[in-house]
Amino acid sequence: MSAQPVDIQIFGRSLRVNCPPDQRDALNQAADDLNQRLQDLKVRTRVTNTEQLVFIAALNISYELTQEKAKTRDYAASMEQRIRMLQQTIEQALLDQGRITEKTGQNFE
């Protein structure tokens, strides 16, 4: 699918961007989110300069993305550790099962 031009409104300004048709809803949702962030910033900071608000919003979004990446890395490391521990537990259980089988002469097939 090729990208098609889409008109969106951000902070009272029209912007035409190219977007694949299957991502149009996500683009509109992102534009709505950015609009809301800019409105909230304008109220909270009392900054009226649009360019300044956009830079502050961009910095906030970048910070949030950095935090989410760190969370994802931490979660992945935690899962890797849990998987290693589970593998060790399974390997030990299989070794123990093999020892029990050798002593009793039973096979559990």
UniProtKB/Swiss-Prot annotation:
Keyword entries, A-Z: Cell cycle, Cell division, Coiled coil, Cytoplasm, Septation
Function: Activator of cell division through the inhibition of FtsZ GTPase activity, therefore promoting FtsZ assembly into bundles of protofilaments necessary for the formation of the division Z ring. It is recruited early at mid-cell but it is not essential for cell division.
Family statement: Belongs to the ZapA family. Type 1 subfamily.
Protein name per its UniProtKB record: Cell division protein ZapA
Coiled-coil positions: 21-97
Localization terms from the record: Cytoplasm
Source superkingdom: Bacteria
Subunit relationships: Homodimer. Interacts with FtsZ.
GO terms of biological process kind: division septum assembly; FtsZ-dependent cytokinesis; septin ring assembly
NCBIfam families: PRK10972.1
UniProt organism field: Salmonella typhimurium (strain LT2 / SGSC1412 / ATCC 700720)
